């Protein structure tokens, strides 16, 4: 009985100290099935959307053509292509390559 009385305050402390799920989820790398599970956790019944990237063809009008020669303006096109690539970061680049938070994952919910 004396052991139980000593452990009771410790048990009460552990129960009260348990972090909430929002605090338990820190910014982290999420890849593959871990990323999908995190999206299910964050989005719940709303669900989430995913549009897989397809391989861009040479004539894709959304991707600026790069001039590899030394013609004038080639540097401008390279800078534009790099800027477009930076703006089109997907969830994998954001959460797997980098780290993301619950708030960033919520951007992918329906």
From Swiss-Prot:
Query: Where does the record say this protein resides?
Result: Secreted
Q: Give the UniProt keywords, A-Z.
A: Carbohydrate metabolism, Cleavage on pair of basic residues, Disulfide bond, Glucose metabolism, Hormone, Secreted, Signal
Cited SUPFAM superfamilies: Insulin-like
Q: What is the lineage of its organism?
A: Eukaryota, Metazoa, Chordata, Craniata, Vertebrata
UniProt name for this protein: Insulin
As one GO molecular function, the record gives: insulin receptor binding
> What's any one GO cellular component for it?
extracellular space
Concerning its family, UniProt says: Belongs to the insulin family.
UniProt lists the gene as INS
Q: Which residues cross the membrane?
A: none
Q: From the record, give the cysteines joined by S-S bonds.
A: 31-96, 43-109, 95-100
Q: What is its main location?
A: secreted
Q: What CDD domains is this protein classified in? A: IlGF_insulin_like
Propeptide residues, per UniProt?
57-87
Question: Subunit comment for this entry?
Answer: Heterodimer of a B chain and an A chain linked by two disulfide bonds.
Q: What does this protein do?
A: Insulin decreases blood glucose concentration. It increases cell permeability to monosaccharides, amino acids and fatty acids. It accelerates glycolysis, the pentose phosphate cycle, and glycogen synthesis in liver.
**A GO BP term, please?**
glucose metabolic process
């Amino acid at each position: 009985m004396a052991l139980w009385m000593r452990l009771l305050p410790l048990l009460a402390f552990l129960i009260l100290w348990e972090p909430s799920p929002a605090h338990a989820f820190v910014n982290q790398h999420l890849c593959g099935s871990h990323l999908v599970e995190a999206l299910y956790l964050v989005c719940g019944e709303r669900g989430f959307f995913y549009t897989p990237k397809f391989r861009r063809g040479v004539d894709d009008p959304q991707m600026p053509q790069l001039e590899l020669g030394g013609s004038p303006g080639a540097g401008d096109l390279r800078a534009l292509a790099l800027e477009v690539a930076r703006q089109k970061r997907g969830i994998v680049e954001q959460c797997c390559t980098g780290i993301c938070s619950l708030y960033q994952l919520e951007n992918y919910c329906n």
